[in-house]
């Protein structure tokens, strides 16, 4: 079992526990009662030139503890002041020491779109992201089926938030495109050993732009 498999399995446990406190019907009703979003995340990435998604992350499996103090709200505000277009907020609690409250507070304090960076394994987490103030969610091809990605993108469209679909090979790119992805992120790391591999990004970027000119990367 890879680290990604372990994280995904733990995410399923998290969803199961969350549903015991707030049911799927309740979180769905709450999300749908909120004003529909305007797809601010993907709009922010459509500007001319390079766009920057800056990340608020306390820890990671490969680096361990990154920021012991972790003044996340201040970090997010400094990103915004420095010209960031969007902010990525880790909410995975075990391996990344994230917290849903980080996303909620940051989204209330900044005026740029926030993406919930987590390991979505259930539609529940998409509705939850909307309630927490996210304008986008991360969907990872390696832990979701094509039909699950399509379903989650459909929910995002209904809520007015964006889906950033993560891929790391050509097969996953094809899957993402078939599922209706409008924004694709290329993961530069081999899952099993967690080592950056920049060449893969350049290769896959070429594959994406040559065959799918409307996609944002």
Task: Mark where each language-model region is.
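Glycine- and Gly-Pro-enriched alpha-helical subdomains that act as flexible
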Residues: 91, 112-125, 131-141, 152-155
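Amphipathic repeat-derived elements
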Residues: 15-17, 22, 141-149
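Generic beta-sheet signal
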Residues: 55, 117, 140, 166, ...
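Short alpha-helix immediately C-terminal to the canonical SAM-binding loop
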Residues: 126, 149, 173
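Solvent-exposed, charged amphipathic helical/linker segments at domain boundaries
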Residues: 144-160
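Conserved N-terminal beta1-alpha1 strand-loop-helix module at the mouth
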Residues: 1-114, 121, 155-182, 192, ...
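Glycine-rich phosphate-binding active-site loops on the catalytic face of alpha/beta enzymes
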Residues: 128-148, 185-194
């Amino acid at each position: 079992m890879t680290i990604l498999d372990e994280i995904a399995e733990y995410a399923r446990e998290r969803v199961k526990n969350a549903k015991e406190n707030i049911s799927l019907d309740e979180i769905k009703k709450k999300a749908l009662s909120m004003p529909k979003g305007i797809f601010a995340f993907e709009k922010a990435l459509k500007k001319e030139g390079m766009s920057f998604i800056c990340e608020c992350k306390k820890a990671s499996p490969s680096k361990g503890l990154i920021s012991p103090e972790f003044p996340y709200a201040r970090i997010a505000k400094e990103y915004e002041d420095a010209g960031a277009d969007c902010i990525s907020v880790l909410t995975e609690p075990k391996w990344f020491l994230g917290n849903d409250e980080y996303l909620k507070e940051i989204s209330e304090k900044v005026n740029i779109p926030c993406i919930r960076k987590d390991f979505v394994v259930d539609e529940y987490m998409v509705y939850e992201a909307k309630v927490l103030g996210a304008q986008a969610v991360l969907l990872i091809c390696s832990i979701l089926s094509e039909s699950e990605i399509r379903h989650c993108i459909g929910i995002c469209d209904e809520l007015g938030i964006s889906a950033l679909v993560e891929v790391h090979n050509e097969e996953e790119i094809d899957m993402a495109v078939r599922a209706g992805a409008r924004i694709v992120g290329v993961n530069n790391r081999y899952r099993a050993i967690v080592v950056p591999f920049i060449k893969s990004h350049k290769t896959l970027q070429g594959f994406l732009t040559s065959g799918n000119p409307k996609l944002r990367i």
